[in-house]
Amino acid sequence: MCIRDRGKILQGAVKQYDKLKHLPSSSEVMIKSIQMHDDDMKEAVCPARVGLSLKGIKPDEIQRGDILTIDDSLEVKTELLITFNQSPYYKGEISDNQMCLINIGLQIKAAKISSRSPFKLILEKPIICKKNDTCLLIKQESTTVRIIGSGKIN
C-alpha cells in the first residue's frame, strides 16, 4: 500500500470497501485498505488519523482540505454569502474588491470581497462547505492583526 499522505476522520467511521464521494471532484471512490500507525485495519472511527488506499482516484488528485463523504449537504462553491462579524481588534478598512483568505476547517482559499452588504465573497478556487459552517477571513499582508473577522455561511 502506497501512503503518500494521511487524513483525519471528523465524523462517524470508515470501513474497508466503503464507497464515498470525493469533494471537490465529485468522483466516487472505494476504500481498498485502511492504515493506522502502520497497522492494517478493517475499520477506523472518529477521531482517528488514517492512511487510506483508494480506488477511483489518483494520489495527485487529492489535496489538503479535500473531503471524502457520504453527506449530501456538503457543497462545492466558488461564491459565498456569509453573515460577517468584523473582529474588534482589526483596525483596517474593509472594501469591495479587497483580497483576503477564507478558512473553513483545513481549507484556506484566496477570495475577493465582492460586496459588503450582503457580505459576498468570490473565490479563486472552489471550497467545500455547508450552510452554517463557520469561516474565518484573514488579511495575510497585514502588519498587525491578520484576522479580519469570522462568519457563518448562508
Regions found by a protein language model. Give the residues of each.
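Conserved catalytic-core segments of large NTP-driven translation/proteostasis enzymes
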Residues: 4-71, 78, 82-84
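C-terminal effector modules of nucleic-acid-centric enzymes and ribosome-associated factors
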Residues: 58-154
